[in-house]
């Protein structure tokens, strides 16, 4: 085991220890450290009460984030650290938040309330690793397992059902059999979770390296009821073939929602309260069909006439996953679009060497005919029949307006 505490977290823990309080790094930062990953955040837990934490570090350095739950955020060297008092939790009448919390002196009681064993470990330089539920062994085995009784963990907070699949997908772990059985049994409880939290978890799940196997139909039925109840094996394969990462999640959403079509996709994403940018981005990928013809440059220009380069890149990635036998063709199409963009090639009316004022000066009447003339000029340019040069375009426009 090799856990190196981040300097700011280490200093805060030292201060708490010197003041006579037990204190540990806890949760995801311990898990990630044991996996050899760099933690994004360092959360700390302590026997000190919130008011004692604020007194120790000074009110100017403290934000009373959630005093009723024992959490104080401490500012140090430009970073924020959440310090939470050891606690147990009462019943969860809403299936999401505890009705009450009770502060306790023992970190083991605090760890017992957490979701999965890999997240229920604490560490301090003085005492080493505190792992009462076998989280380190589960990390070594590659298993996600609930702390204690799985049904109780999911009854407390139904969002943990999605977190189960998200953590398993993130690390490529298997799910403990009893834990998954409980998750499926209580999947209907996801109805009481806000759609914003569901969308956030689904985004994280779809951002994982290979999330296909973790898209469980018995769970998705309650968070994406719009999806047909058929086998998801094809969608899983397509999603796994697409690039991974948060910036690529739009393309994976499109692969998942493809059976719904554009209108169905929009409705599903609106219900999840996704941003307009996400709704438009995913719907665009769903509606656009792969070109049938191999006219590479022309197809690339037509796509760039409708979409920006990033959307074209997403489309070609999606089509490659949908039609792997045409992957080379779609890769070439993407490269052609990238080349055309780098060359500032004319693919839109706005990129023509003439504009509406030029055409009116050349005798084209304003109104619908003006727009048709510009579109005709663009077609001549992108098909290569005319160069994008002002004199050539005006000469053609004069013929067009006379016809």
Regions found by a protein language model. Name each.
Residues 1-403:
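Catalytic cores of the polymerase beta-like nucleotidyltransferase superfamily
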